[in-house]
């Protein structure tokens, strides 16, 4: 059994969903491990990770709009406002989604469905560089 750690950086342009599947698959293909488990963890509290459909961009649009409605940018609603009107809503959205994803790896392939992709869900308005820790365990 082996373990490999790796970190990728994703540059966001503000709120939205950013597909990082290709970066992860590219890294995975270079590893000696053929079968195992891959855990991906985002090292931030105002962005998150989701597995979502990659075929119809309307899915991503609707997902973002849904979360904007349940966690609106209105400082009157929140006590934590020192980092801007988007900060507390970003924390709420991150709490309602995932900060880590675990996937099986079989024959060097991520076990994703046909229409599934890995997304970083940026909840802040401004651009950020987000770090994603990859921990691969297997043989």
Model regions: which residues?
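Active-site histidine-anchored catalytic micro-motif
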Residues: 1-139
